[in-house]
Amino acid sequence: MSPAGIRNRALQLAALYSPGGDTIRPMLHRRRGVKIGRRTWVGFDTLIEPSYPHRVEIGDRVALGIRVLILAHFAHLGRNRESASGELDDRVSVRIEDDVFIGPGAIIMPNVTIGHGAVVTSGSVVTRSVAPLTMVQGNPARPIARCGVPLGLDTPIKEFYAHLTPIASTSAT
């Protein structure tokens, strides 16, 4: 492993277990190359793309719950867009826009955008992009509600629930 790779892994391990979800953890991930906006919370034991951190972009006022996993490539499946030299290109693979809430244990797969104000419920697996102000749930994650207001760190939960509109299920029961 190269010195840069060792540095990346050391910063990643420090970020997993450091205190300071809104201070130290985001700062360590920024040093790894993850683009992280202001006032973003990174939960304990959250793993953000181990090998290609520069392929992840996280907006302002985002909350990542405990044990969130964000993957930005599939090296072993050969789905990467590689350059002629065999290296991954520098395109962002995972984009999390402003005011997004991602619940504990959620998994974000490569090549998705999570739109402004979206909510990913706990344990969900996001395999496709999520529309702005939409709540998704399940494996694979599917839209279950429209959010009238983002679930921000400063948003009273009663206000969030008051503006939540369920999406009618299209599946037969």
Where are each of the predicted segments found?
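Beta-rich strand-turn-strand
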Residues: 104-128
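Terminal amphipathic alpha-helical/low-complexity segments used for targeting or macromolecular assembly
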Residues: 1-33, 39, 61, 74-77, ...
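Outer-envelope exported proteins of Gram-negative bacteria
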Residues: 59-65, 117, 121-123, 133
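Conserved acidic donor-binding loop of glycosyltransferase catalytic domains
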Residues: 72, 121, 127-128, 144-146
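Conserved active-site beta-strand element of glycosyltransferases/polysaccharide synthases
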Residues: 136
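Hydrophobic beta-strand core residues of beta-sandwich domains
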Residues: 34-36, 96, 114, 130
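Flexible, glycine/small-residue-enriched loop-and-beta-strand segment within the central core
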Residues: 25-27, 43-113, 139-140, 146-149, ...
